[in-house]
Regions:
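Alpha/beta-hydrolase active-site loop
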Residues: 68-98
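N-terminal cap/lid segment of alpha/beta-hydrolase-fold proteins
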Residues: 1-22
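Conserved alpha/beta-hydrolase
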Residues: 47-65
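The serine-hydrolase catalytic nucleophile loop
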Residues: 32-45, 67, 209
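Short beta-strand/loop motif that positions the catalytic acidic residue
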Residues: 190-191, 196-199, 203
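Hydrolase active-site cap/lid region
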Residues: 118, 122-170
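Conserved alpha/beta-hydrolase "acid-adjacent" motif
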Residues: 204-210, 233
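Catalytic histidine-centered segment of alpha/beta-hydrolase-like enzymes
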Residues: 228-239
């Protein structure tokens, strides 16, 4: 995979499509959190389906600069899209790629599912896939307890992941406001036809009921599974690819 930097801070891996087509179709992948960047295999799969793929790290996470959650992660996606008109430069050998996407799609899971849903508010984004997405941060107290016994979640992240996430207590607490990076806060702006969600009813981290309620309130299509836990985005996309491809093309 190639590497590029956008807006000075945002580092991303990217791949061109395996076969060039008449249309430039781009998929942007949004990671969960906390997680280790390992969607390279998914990026390769999507490249073989003839899509450009960009796999960014949020500001303040992993290779990217900045402070995590200083800005809403979906703004990182918007900023990345802003720079595409300039083309993409591989930082390793300086090779330049021209990319003027005719269609832009976003795929995100869990924490990144919120980024995908909020990215759908951008008119340049045609469709998004949200896999076991966080749609309302009111779930935070219970989900934190499911992940760690540390009462200070941001402190846990700093201890467990070091500088992989430059996360302050103040920035983490912004999620509890109900307005910051929260799809539910934007329910009135959602275009239901742009979003497809996948979720398992036995998810231990993101309650199915919260996603079902979001789907009912917005009209967004939700494909449910009886079992599966906290679904892997890579496995979901590959297993459901024919469904996703049809959704993208309509």
């Amino acid at each position: 995979m190639f590497r590029a930097r956008f807006k000075k801070d945002i580092v991303a891996e990217f791949l061109p499509p395996a076969r060039a087509g008449k249309k430039h179709k781009l998929i942007i992948l949004c990671d969960g959190m906390p997680s280790i960047p390992r969607k390279q295999a998914l990026a390769s799969f999507l490249s073989r389906q003839d899509y450009w793929v960009i796999y960014p790290r949020y500001r303040g996470a992993w290779e990217s600069g900045g402070q995590f959650l200083e800005k809403s992660p979906h703004e990182d996606i918007r900023d990345l899209i802003d720079e595409l008109a300039q083309g993409i430069r591989d930082v390793t050998f300086g090779r330049r790629f021209a990319l003027s996407p005719d269609e832009i799609f976003v795929i995100g899971g869990s924490f990144g599912g919120a980024a995908a849903i909020l990215s759908s508010l951008d008119a340049r984004v045609k469709k998004v896939i949200a896999n076991c997405p966080v749609v309302d941060w009111s779930i935070l107290p219970k989900s934190e307890k499911a992940e760690t016994s540390n009462p200070n979640y941001a402190a846990y992240i700093r201890e467990a992941f070091g500088n992989a996430y430059r996360l302050s207590d103040r920035n983490w607490k912004k999620l509890s406001s109900g307005k910051f990076y929260n799809p539910t806060h934007h329910i009135g702006e959602i275009t239901s036809s742009k979003i497809l969600m996948f979720h398992a009813k036995d998810d231990p981290y993101v309650p199915y009921a919260s996603v079902e309620r979001f789907a009912q309130r917005t009209g967004v299509k939700l494909k449910s599974f009886l079992r599966g836990g906290h679904l892997s985005t890579e496995r979901t996309v590959q297993k459901q690819w024919l469904v996703i491809k049809k959704f993208f093309e309509t």
